[in-house]
A protein has these predicted regions:
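Extracytoplasmic small-molecule ligand-binding "clamshell" domains
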Residues: 18-102, 193
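Short loop->beta-strand "edge-of-pocket" segments that line small-molecule binding or catalytic clefts
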Residues: 23-28, 42, 129, 157-175
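Periplasmic-binding protein-like
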Residues: 27-29, 116-130, 135-143, 216, 263-279, ...
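Ligand-binding cleft/hinge of the Venus flytrap
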Residues: 36, 49-65, 158, 171-194, ...
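Short helices/loops that flank or line small-molecule/ion binding pockets
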Residues: 38, 50, 68-91, 103-109, ...
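A ligand-binding cleft/hinge motif common to bilobed small-molecule-binding domains
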Residues: 84, 92-122, 177-180, 205-240
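Flexible hinge/capping segments at coil-to-helix
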Residues: 134-137, 146-166
């Protein structure tokens, strides 16, 4: 293949961008954040994207993609690849952590699966750019969830987990927090379940365990599917959490500045909380600093 042919193939792989549109990449399977099944779409991130596009006087186009909800390099690389391939202007539902922003650790990566993608797209490699965030529009937190039949005492600190049967998904941030709390004081009460295989909240519902520490969005999604549930959010939220926003390439700084103004307007008018309530999501406002430091083991120590 000639050099010109290679260039033509690369340009041909990039989608055409219509004037007056705002294209946002959203994960297709994170209930209450963003969901796409057939013609059905829903979620808080989708509503925020719609509201931002309206304030920018643009038509929203959503590029749905597939990736796991993990705050690690997988999401970071997937997001960067989609943006660098011009699949979207921005990507929503992104954790604002220093290690997930800026220049990537690798220069080239494959694209994640995305709606409309072909076999050639799955094989292609994309040169990555520098990620730049918008201001956050909500916060992702870990919350104590209890079986309301078995646990009646208030849970206001991790000390209140003492004496309860604790279930936790192994290898997660919640696992690290509970296993290291007060030099392992809760270790003998903890049962580890396997993420994506064991039904953590279902096991809690059955009475096999008393309490867990889980992302509040997951609990909200469980309640939406099981309105008669015995499970309750006990009120305790761990201090370690992550602000969530949109992310784009640093070359889109002007667009990101405009989006910042739109998000600020939505926040000032109380629209963000109303949009979250409309999809059944407990709204937690962002906290300073807007961008969190990378988590170290020393951060897990009780403060």
């Amino acid at each position: 293949m000639t050099v010109l042919a290679v260039i033509a193939a690369t340009l041909g792989a990039q989608p055409a961008r219509a004037e007056g549109t705002l294209t946002v990449c959203l994960n297709e399977d994170i209930p209450l954040y963003s969901l796409h099944h057939g013609k059905e779409t829903s979620g808080f991130d989708l509503k925020v994207a719609e509201a931002v596009a309206q304030r920018l006087d643009r038509k929203l186009v959503v590029q749905w993609f597939e990736t796991k909800l993990e705050m690690d390099s997988s999401l970071t690389i997937d997001a960067n690849a989609l943006l660098s391939d011009k699949r979207c202007d921005l990507l929503g539902g992104y954790p604002l952590i220093k290690g997930t922003l800026g220049k990537p650790r690798v220069e080239i990566a494959r694209l994640p699966g995305f709606d409309g993608g072909t076999a050639d797209d799955r094989r292609r490699r994309v040169r990555l750019g520098e990620l730049m965030p918008t201001r956050p529009y909500h916060r992702s937190v870990l919350a104590a969830v209890v079986n309301g039949t078995a646990v009646t005492k208030p849970i206001t600190t991790l000390a209140d987990f003492d004496g309860l049967r604790i279930a936790i998904e192994g290898g997660t941030l919640a696992d690290a927090i509970l296993m290291t709390w007060r030099d392992g004081r809760l270790v003998k009460q903890i049962t580890h379940l396997i993420p994506e295989r064991d039904d953590l909240l279902g096991r809690l519902e059955s009475g096999a365990f008393d309490v867990t520490l889980v992302n509040l969005r997951r609990f909200d999604a469980y309640v939406a599917k099981n309105p008669g549930t015995k499970l309750k959010a006990a009120g305790f939220q761990h201090r370690i959490g992550f602000n969530m926003g949109l992310v784009g390439l640093a070359t889109s700084a002007d667009l990101i500045a405009a989006v910042d103004k739109a998000i600020a307007d939505l926040d000032q008018k109380g629209e963000l909380a109303r949009m979250a309530a409309a999809v059944g999501l407990t709204y937690v406002p962002p906290r300073a600093p807007q961008i969190a430091d990378n988590i170290a083991m020393s951060d897990l120590a009780e403060k």
